[in-house]
Amino acid sequence: NLLDIGYFRLGFYWFPFEKSYPRKQKRDHIFKDGTKIDYAIQLYYFDFDLRNSFLRYISRVEINFRTKLIYMASNKYKEDPFWYVNSKYVEKSFLNSKAFQDAIRDANTETIVKQDLNRYSRSHAPAWKVLEYLSFGVVISLFDNLKDGGLKHAISMEYGMGSSTQFSNYMNTIRRLRNFCAHGKVL
């Protein structure tokens, strides 16, 4: 088991079994009477299973949010399937940001997007193709940088929230939890 988990990683799970717990400074690494290494291993596997459970449901939230953003914005801006790169609809500072530019460049390398760009000889594919390949964080930032407060409000209301700022805060909290889970951090 130790080779499966790693000594350093398992150390995070020993902490609750130490006499010095919850004190983080000057830990003495002396275990409470009756403590077995299996307790830390069991805690590790519980944490592992919990992270995977969270990921299962967070994935559904992420896909649902992405779908609603694409659907609602694309229906509002029917005349412009490339609304996600148009400064008429999205803050110019965001469109010019390195993070967004890099995300679009990466999305353009995906087979479906590349085929669209080549087939129609254009520099951008429609939102419903490209946004599928953007990270959750970039999609949230795109939402945050929409110029139309009414659209942001309507999307937020789909989740029962009247404030798009509060909704964005919730989505960013979910994103951080997702990243913790996806990268194996200790919950």
Tell where the protein language model's regions lie, with residue ranges.
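Acidic/aromatic/glycine-rich contiguous surface patches that form carbohydrate-binding/processing clefts
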Residues: G184
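Extended intrinsically disordered or low-complexity regions, especially N/C-terminal cytosolic tails and loops
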Residues: N1-R176
